Each structure stands twice: as structure tokens, then as C-alpha cells.
Amino acid sequence: MDTVLLLVSLCISAAFCNNEEERLLNDLMKNYNKNLRPVEKDGDIISVSIKLTLTNLISLNEKEEALTTNVWVEMQWKDYRLSWDPNDYHGISMMRIPSTSVWLPDVGLENNVDGTFDIALYTNTLVSSDGSMYWLPPAIYRSSCPVVVTYFPFDWQNCSIVFQSQTYSANEIELLLTVDEQTIEWIEIDPEAFTENGEWAIKHMPAKRIINHRLPRDDVNYQQIVFYLIIQRKPLFYIINIIVPCVLISFVSILVYFLPAKAGGQKCTVSINILLAQTVFLFLVAQKIPETSTSVPLIVKYLTFLMVVTITIVANAVIVLNISLRTPNTHSMSSTVRELCLRTVPRLLRMHLRPTDAAPPLAPLMRRSSSLGLMMKADEYMLRKPRSQLMFEKQKERDGLMKVVLDKIGRGMENNTSDDLVHSLNHAAPEIRTCVEACCHIASATREKNDFKSENEEWILMGRVIDRVCFLVMCFVFFLGTIGTFLAGHFNQAPAHPFPGDSKLYQPST
């Protein structure tokens, strides 16, 4: 029985309270016009306090220069028409009234990029008995954010979210930052709902009330509430997916210097393939950054630098190939160039080159060439010689003629000089004069061939020396440019204070 009485009393109380809220709402809305500014006199100014709570930094589209954020916009003001005495309404001190039924300050996002000035959801408005209004609607804003791409992808950006009244001037409403024990001059972050962005790290979140004194007070642009988001990019994605592969591919282009000097075609093929790969990386970066001519991104500078290095390597390969294929018939090497490129520079670079004037290594080649030539000339001599002479060669030996000839040749060989040998052969017998002339021709041709080949090898060695010098220069330039690029990006950090010259941190005091 007691339980039944308790339930009945609770139901009656709830019904009574609902009736009181309904009566209060009817009394408040009676003769209420939501289109009129809630002022008692024409000269009164309504103070509207604004606070921004960030729940998610969704993205920053560099191409469109648009910042997308998920926020809660808190607005507070007073409406004297919506005040009551709680004692008259069973102690009710707060009411929830649909925001579409009351006057709202027409404060919207000024720097939007999609034409949406309004909030996303019209939530209820909390109304206190003294007429204080509290409205906390959620919104997803796409605000304009001019992107500075000078140090991309090691950059930081200063984006702003600007609020101002669309129709009311400063003589009608006054925009202020919310005051709660102290003026909240920053963007609040809800620790329970906030989701960290994977690409951007928030460094500073200051807020300011901007007054443009160059405009009159009755201008709607006279006052603004600006919330700043100073964010630093996390460059790991671009380092792993663009910079590191590009550096490795470009380093391969330097390794073409280890190919032989005469392999110029293979050098050019490898370098041009690497150049095409670098062009693809440059195209990928161009799709990410805005189309601006005010500045060149750091990564574009670096990719252009690598392309210049690769093109230089291709040009060097063509020049070295031209030098390596030179012959004494078309070019002659001066003594100064020979001394510089084949002696001085290799000695400084500690290159182990065969001395150009070393005769012993050529001796086996000369002997092989001479033997081969003599055999060919001997075969030709046997074909041209009459058969009657071949039939009586043994008879000449019996007559002692061959013995005399061999003695004279032997005396020339004992002197161990080619001139004495030729002189002995000339006086040996008239029959072998033709053979002597053939031998002289073979020896002269062999010397010319060896000299030709030796000078041809000098051009090849010169190409090797140029390759080594260019390899060292390109390595130095490559590493210097790479280190300089990364250092420039490393030192481009967001400032310690949000505004230059202002030591205030614009954050909650701890």
C-alpha cells in the first residue's frame, strides 16, 4: 500500500513539474518575437561571448587550401524577455528551448570555402532564470587557410577560423571572448572526444578579438573573433614514400661512373631511366601542393637539384665517350694534357694507371704481331716465287751459297741491332732483297700499329681519369645538397610563441 502511494505521488509530482515547465514556456513565448534584438532601449548593446572547442582536426587540403575541423561553438548572451522568478514556477531555474524559437546572434564563419556560413545542427538553447542564454551547437567547418609551401614537407602552417556577425554592427552587438575566471584566449580541446591528426601536430591555439580601427563602428567588419591553429606537419610519410626512394634512385645514377669509360651508351641509358623516375616523383609532389608561383617547395627544389645532377651525369657520359673513342687519326694529345691527365691527376687521386711510356708490356704483343706478319709475308712470298727456284734451293745450299748468306746474317744478329740486321740482309744476296723489303715493311707497320694502339689507350685512360674526377665531384655535390636540404627542413620549426614580439603563450595557466 505504501509503495502504491509513493508511485502515485511521484507521478503527480512529475505531471505537476511538466505542467509548470509548459506553463513557463507558454508564458515566456507569449508575445515573444525571435526576429527582434533583445534590448530594452535602442542604444543598448548585446554582449555575445564566443568560445571554440576542438574535437577533431580532420584535414588540411593543401591543394584547395582548406582546413576542415570538427568543433563546438559556444555562445552566451542575455535575453531580458526570457527571464522569470523561479519561485513562481515551482523552483524551475533553467529551461531548454529549441534554438529555432529564440533570437540567435547571426555569428557565422567568415572565411569559409564552401559557402556554408551556418552551423550543422541547431541544438536546444539553455535558458537561465536571469535571462542568460547558452547555446552549444556542433559544426564541421571548412575554412580557408593560405598554405605557405616554401619548406614543404617540413613546413608549419598558421590557419585561422574567423567569426563575425553578418548583419549587426558593433553598435548593436559586441563580440567577446568567453570569460571563466580568466579570459579564454585559446581554443579549448575536449580530451575525451579529441582525435589526434596523423599528419599535423597542433603547436599553438590562440584566440584574439580583432578590432579594425580603420573602419567605422557601424561596419560589420569592424570586429571579429579569430581562433588560430598553428600546426606543424609530420613529415615521416613524405620521407619514407618520396624522399628516401628518390635519394636511393639518384645515388644509383652516381654509380654509373664505375662502368667502363667506353660504355657511354649504358651510362646514358641508366641515367635517363633514373631521370624518368625522378620526373614521376616530381609529378606526385605537384599533385599535392597548391598551384602557386609565390614560392617553390623545398622538396621540389631538392628533386630539381637531383634532376640537374642526373642530367650532368648524362652530359659527362657523352663527353667521356667522345674522349674514349678518339684516335690518333682525328685527334692528337698535347704534352700538357698528357702530363696533367695521365700523370698529375692520377697521382693525386691515387689511381693505378699503367705508365704510357712503359715498353716491356708491349714487347710480347710486338713479338706476336711480328711473328704473325712474318708468317703471312712468308706465305705470300712462297706463292709468288717461281717453282723452278723452289726446286733448286737444296742445290744452292750444296753450292755453299746459303752458307755465305747465313754467315752474313749471323754477323748482323751478333751486333744485336735491327739496322745491322737489315744492312747484313741487304748485302747477303740479291735474291732475298724482296724479302728484306717485306720485313722492313712489316716492322714499320708493327711499330705504327703499336704506337696507334698506345695513343688510343691514352685517350681511354684519360676518359677514366675524367670519370673519377666527376665521380668525386658529383658525390660531394650530392651529399652536400641532400644534407643542406634536410638541415633547412629540420630548422624550420613552429615558433615558441604564437605571435612575434608577444611573449604570451595563450594557453591555460597550469
Swiss-Prot record:
Which cysteines does the record link by disulfide bonds?
145-159
Question: What's the domain of life for this entry?
Answer: Eukaryota
Give the sites modified to Phosphotyrosine.
381
Glycosylated position list: 158
Q: How does it sit in the bilayer? A: Multi-pass membrane protein
Subunit composition and interactions:
Pentamer of two alpha chains, and one each of the beta, delta, and gamma (in immature muscle) or epsilon (in mature muscle) chains.
Name this protein carries in UniProt: Acetylcholine receptor subunit gamma
- Organism for this UniProt entry: Xenopus laevis (African clawed frog)
Q: What gene codes for this chain?
A: chrng
